[in-house]
Amino acid sequence: VEFKPKKNNENNILFDFQDVKNHPFGNNIKLFISSIDKYFKFLKNHDIHIKSQNNFPHSSGIASSASSMSCLSSCLVDIESLNTKSKEDSYYMKKKSFIARLGSGSASRSIQGPITLWGSSNSYLGSSDLYAINISDDVNKVFHDYQNSILIIDPGVKKISSSIGHKLMNENPFSNTRFDLARN
């Protein structure tokens, strides 16, 4: 992420993905940044150029948005911290996770780890719907070195976006029951 003082009053956000200038995913990034500018005073006075690389296929359903939103959120909070009075690391970790969640719920869990929990739970003191917390110390050590293997059969774009899927879930008459089950 590069940023420099604005030359005009326009909201200048450039996004390159895999060295492709103004990649279509840039529209999602611009909407995201517009939705979070109230949390970052410096965004109103700066132009931003984001150059992104990702080894996950875009919009395929395997967390490419989580990795991008967690990385972008971390960069923005790190930039903000350059010009703010020193705060504890836990403040910045919570803010990174909070901002990442606004871009992708899964992104909130990608900030710290290795094992995190996002969502308020009676089982974990300090858990929150607003940001993820590290629960690595509470999990059996056998899970501390687990790894995933992902076989990509079709790198194409999935038919239903996560945003549409989430909207369908929120409008589902069984959603409150599902959310309650997830919390307990």
State where each predicted segment sits.
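Short acidic, glycine/serine/threonine-rich loops at helix termini
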Residues: 62-64, 112-113, 121-122, 161-165
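ATP-binding N-lobe of GHMP and related small-molecule kinases
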Residues: 1-60, 74-90
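Generic secondary-structure signature for well-ordered alpha-helical cores
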Residues: 34, 38, 77, 81, ...
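Structured loops at beta-to-helix junctions and adjacent beta-edge loops in soluble globular domains
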Residues: 4-6, 121, 151-154
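Alpha/beta catalytic cores of group-transfer enzymes, especially the acyltransferase/condensing modules
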Residues: 91-144
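A short glycine/serine-rich beta->alpha loop
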Residues: 17-21, 54-63, 100, 104, ...
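C-terminal nucleotide
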Residues: 10, 137-184
